[in-house]
């Protein structure tokens, strides 16, 4: 009853998490694969509120664990050290230092861009929120939407308008089909073939290693693929460089290696992981970041691959 409204896969994953810690019942965490299904599908408003408050106040001086893992002093120290670093390098502040290698010319230009974007986007956001409030009132008798209600009633509205749910799409995106589909797209567009290797050391059994070969069977680059959420792993999804392409002093060419990291739901009870449509988009997006790094022809480390792309242009490639 506590988890009514949720698809079978979410409670099964939560039960598996509890069993892994030798606990009874189910274990809900603030990792996105655990948190998001509760906020989107769980009929229990009190549980949604509890999860929302815990998530939005994590590592702070607020909320149910106020001060226990408070990162505020760490943030203050980071800001102070960044300011000191910027001044040592001759910049007025860290924002000026950061923009020295980016397309934007100065902090005011960035603020003007963001202010203009907010001005243009806000009317649409307000319109959609008004429509959601009207829907929740008409269909469910909800007088006032709380922050922990937004995702839940947005999903109800989507099902009402379009008769479709993310949960209905997941069986079409098992992990192997999604990953192999990504590799097939890359092969068709770039003539690049991904080949797995099992003789490379990895930091967790979930992690896999692949090499990319072009049509001449030349090794162009490699990457570690770390797809699943797990305890003590940083949240989110990202690509990062392990090593960049570089012509070394002895004349040999160091080939690029990337990290492609996500936090998707893991396989449960021997069944393959089923990805949401958003997860598939994320997978393609992060691989899109990896391609410029791994396929570069530049042999000077400081400008090879993503090192040669301004930071505020990085999202354009993926």
Regions found by a protein language model. Give the residues of each.
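Short, charge-rich amphipathic alpha-helices with coiled-coil/heptad character
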Residues: 41-62
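Hydrophobic alpha-helix feature that most strongly marks membrane-spanning transmembrane helices
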Residues: 56, 228, 265-268, 288, ...
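Active-site recognition of the HExxH zinc-binding catalytic motif
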Residues: 83-86, 90, 186, 266, ...
